[in-house]
Regions:
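Active-site anion-handling motifs in enzyme catalytic cores
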Residues: 1-320
């Protein structure tokens, strides 16, 4: 069985997106192995520059997948810009097209919450490109559990409805998304399923029981006001002020340690890097009961660390 898992990143600093990709493969692999069905996973948006077979660990399971070339131009301008790359890597380009033509399923995880226009039209176009390929090659594709919407732009909403309606199976990870789809397409079957990251294996990290351990995820994207840096997501509060207030409150409590736990990590500063903002807060407070968590190398390490908390708060979905 040939399975394309689209909009699924594996080599990415957003540990939540990686958790979705890892968990999706982990669950499907487990089900198909139990039925003795041979299968191959293909990831066109894995994040790896080197195409071909890769392996990733999920607990005691080794998952194999093939990283593909991303062949979908978002616009004519984008196509022209990438034309030289397509010509230079013509064999790879044709090999990727062959995978799409022969695939049994396209399963789309949508990076969790990117099947929407809250991140802008370009992000939606990139996500929706896999829907277009599914329709172009007449493939059975399913929308894996994810957030769907919101959509502010009517033209984007119209495209989204076409894509959802064509899908063989539609799964959401929250009731709000399920109800949203039912309002858009009353006759479309849609299921509400828990987030696939709940199935990701982990090993609970043990902390000193003398303290109450409070985990806090600080979103860099919210800290800076979104990509536009002008309160893109319409928050009703001053987010940095709120974070300082939360930290101050818990540090004033007896026997409480506050752990700053990033969702997005990286070695360089950028607008989504939670670790950089957490590091700055850690340096600013210089408090013995404020802990900066490790820079997690994979989502399993992050989940294992979070599992050791007594109480947790987070802005990003997978942090919570």
């Amino acid at each position: 069985m040939e399975i394309i898992i689209s909009n699924a990143a594996v080599n990415n600093g957003n540990r939540g997106c990686v958790a979705l990709s890892l968990s999706s493969m982990y669950i499907i692999d487990k089900i198909l192995n139990a039925k003795n069905i041979p299968h191959t996973f293909y990831l066109p948006q894995s994040g790896y520059d080197q195409k071909g077979e890769h392996m990733i660990r999920a607990g005691d399971v080794t998952l194999k997948f093939v990283s593909l070339m991303d062949i979908t131009p978002l616009t004519v301008k984008h196509y022209i810009k990438n034309l030289i790359k397509y010509i230079a890597k013509w064999k790879e380009y044709q090999a990727t097209k062959k995978v799409y033509k022969e695939a049994d399923f396209i399963l789309d995880i949508g990076q969790g919450d990117s099947f929407a226009d809250i991140y802008g039209k370009r992000r939606f176009d990139w996500i929706f490109s896999q829907y277009r390929l599914g329709m172009k090659f007449k493939k059975t594709y399913c929308i894996l559990p994810q957030t769907i919407g919101p959509f502010k732009e009517p033209t984007i909403l119209k495209q989204a409805c076409i894509g959802i309606d064509y899908a063989k199976c539609v799964m959401t990870r929250d009731r709000q998304s399920r109800d949203f789809v039912k309002r858009l397409l009353p006759n479309k079957a849609v299921s509400e399923i828990i987030d696939v990251a709940f199935f990701m294996p982990y090993k609970k990290k043990e902390f000193n029981s003398d303290s109450i351990h409070v985990g806090l995820n600080v979103s860099a994207l919210l800290w800076y006001g979104g990509y536009t840096r002008n309160n893109q997501f319409g928050l009703k509060v001053d987010y940095p002020l709120l974070i300082h207030s939360v930290i101050d409150y818990f540090l004033a409590q007896a026997n409480v340690k506050v752990h700053l736990i990033p969702h997005v990590v990286g070695g360089e500063r950028h607008i989504e890097n939670d670790y950089a903002v957490s590091y700055d807060l850690f340096e600013e407070y210089d408090h013995p009961n404020l802990v900066l968590s490790p820079l997690f190398l994979d989502p399993i390490a992050a989940k294992s660390y979070i599992a050791g908390m007594d109480f947790f708060m987070g802005a990003r979905m997978h942090s919570t």
